[in-house]
Amino acid sequence: VSDHPTDFVGSVEEAITSSLKAKMPDAVVEVSGGGGHYKIAVVSTAFAGKSMLESQRLVLSTIKHLINGANPPVHAVDSLTTRTP
């Protein structure tokens, strides 16, 4: 169990993936990184008709609980790729 207010169990990568799949069930999610810095790639129909910025905002708003706070497990998303299938 993490010491972050979200109290997720498992790795940060698993927490990111499960959060995104809860919001976008059809999503194919790839997360890599560590030390608070992560690369995220998401393929989902949820991005259809959205601009790149809108798609990236959707992803970041979905994982904001892992980014915000005094000692967040995610300090930076170094790369974020969003695509439709």
Residue ranges and their predicted role:
Residues 12-20:
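Short amphipathic alpha-helix segments
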Residues 41-56:
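A short interface-forming secondary-structure element
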Residues 60-85:
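C-terminal structural segments of small proteins and small subunits
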Residues 37, 56, 75:
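Histidine-centered active-site/metal-ligand motif
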Residues 1-12:
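N-terminal presequence-like segments and adjacent domain-start helices
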Residues 18, 57, 61:
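Active-site phosphate/pyrophosphate- and oxyanion-stabilizing loops and adjacent acidic/basic residues
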Residues 30-32, 41-43, 81-83:
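Solvent-exposed beta-strand sheet faces enriched in polar/charged residues
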Residues 22-39:
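Short edge beta-strands and adjacent turn/loop segments
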